[in-house]
Amino acid sequence: MEVAALFFMIVAMLLIGTPIAVALGLSSITFLLVLSDTSLASIAQTFFQAMAGHYTLLAIPFFILASSFMSTGGVAKRIIRFSIAIVGHFPGGLAIAGVFACMLFAALSGSSPATVVAIGTIVIAGMRQVGYSKDFAAGVIANAGTLGILIPPSIVMVVYASATDVSVGRMFLAGVIPGLLAGTMLMVTIYVIAKIRNLPKGEWLGWQEVFASGLDAIWGLFLIVIILGGIYGGIFTPTEAAAVAAVYAFLVATFIYRDMGPLATPEGQPNIPIWRKPQALLTAFVHRDTRDALFQAGKLTITLMFIIANALILKHVLTDEQIPQQIASSMLSAGFGPIMFLVVVNVILLIGGQFMEPSGLIVIVAPLVFPIAMELGIDPIHLGIIMVVNMEIGMITPPVGLNLFVTSGVAGMPMMRVVKAALPFLAVLFVFLILVTYVPVLSTWLPNTFMGPELITK
């Protein structure tokens, strides 16, 4: 009964418009004070215990900072040019190139909203110029942007790994095949629609443009090699890889591409050689562009970590009340097998994803369903990818789908119009969710092959 009161408080606060983090934290603290034996003096200790051991979360601010520099530094323009050179000549070529560019940028940013902003700002305008409807363009980008949390490195995967104490490296590997499959399914869908509607296609620009655009984008794309190669080559931990990625992204954006900082020039003008402005080596660190990128990354980090911190308090309360064990006992005694259990998990996450930010929802739900999944023999990495895919869908379902709001701003469209535009492609993601849920080898083959199965010792 007490736990029902806790969830009632959370839902009631969300319904009256209380921010998610405040609703989670305030409800949990009220529960500790009123409905449990915990004293006010012990709440700080409870908060400390909730945060203790989650050192993997240190990777999040660095990945956000790397994404901020990459978004500011014009890497997106080069990735889009490269994508158009490769797939732009197919029917619906610019839309397909938009999805391909989102896949590449997702491997740099780890964030869906950042992917929508960086790629959508350019691609939606370009699609309108060559004859696509604004609705079609917005629907493509809203859905393709969700790949930002599925293709590694992914901030949401880091949160899941921290909440369940599984390997971040295995989670990143597990996201590769599903990420490529989701992107391919979206591109094939666009191709079929383009053939039916006779949508415009570009010209084949030749291998010279492919190589030229690839060389132009290679410094940005090399970040993928640094992160994944560093982790799986045993050079970095995931947290160290995130920190190195942030430094590398700053150097590329400021000193190589020179799209930000003291060496930046208006588009179409030649770059300023470093020897003509040597003071840039120092002033770049305090330049307005750098400060802006740091400020934006800091705001997002504080928002995200505040949600996670309050969700961890709720997780701590639920664990103390032995809620996961009670749920596991009830479901197992009711005869739930793996198939039915995964149906229930998907329903819970799809509903929750409509109202909550992905990281906070995972911190709450993962500890509840994780013990049951282990009892049923479900691979913890497979469970993690299922949860991430559900979070993808949650980001494009109202009323709180973040990608819908971001796409609405980028495309200059009312939110409900973006929702309607995204629906046809949302159906593709539902089919993809079924595949990922019931074909576990899609998620487990790479991590099991290269790193062995995840071993849960507690």
Which role does the model predict for each range below?
Residues 1-458:
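Alpha-helical transmembrane segments of multi-pass membrane transport proteins
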